[in-house]
A protein has these predicted regions:
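Segments forming oxygen-rich coordination pockets for charged ligands
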Residues: 2-112
Length: 112
């Protein structure tokens, strides 16, 4: 299970700084492109630490769990960055809380 700390952008950066100072590994996820129905805009951010604790949001809940899992995997593999792409068809949109289908691209990177 993942634990969310905050949604405010200012708090996200403060939280990341606190985690880094306490020697935790941190991944920053940033929305870099959207198409169609997307609850959050380009530039939305989320941080994730190695324990799965996160602050912020990149999709309003639609793909957060996948982004958290990918972020933890990035830390485990000691990779620096990765681009994630998620597509939701019109038929599946309601299942993830969207009015219609869309696409979201998210860039994740370690910031330690």
């Amino acid at each position: 299970m993942y634990l969310m700390k905050s949604l405010l952008k200012e708090n996200i950066l403060e939280e990341a700084n606190t985690w880094i100072k306490s020697n935790q590994k941190v991944v920053l996820a940033t929305v870099i492109q959207t198409w169609g129905s997307s609850p959050l805009q380009v530039g939305s951010k989320m941080i994730v630490n190695e324990k799965g604790i996160f602050s912020g949001s990149v999709s309003g809940g639609c793909v957060e769990s996948s982004v958290i899992s990918e972020s933890i995997e990035l830390i485990k593999k000691n990779s620096k960055f990765k681009k994630l792409e998620f597509e939701v068809s019109n038929e599946n949109a309601w299942d993830v809380g969207l009015a219609c289908g869309g696409e979201i691209k998210i860039f994740i990177e370690q910031i330690n």
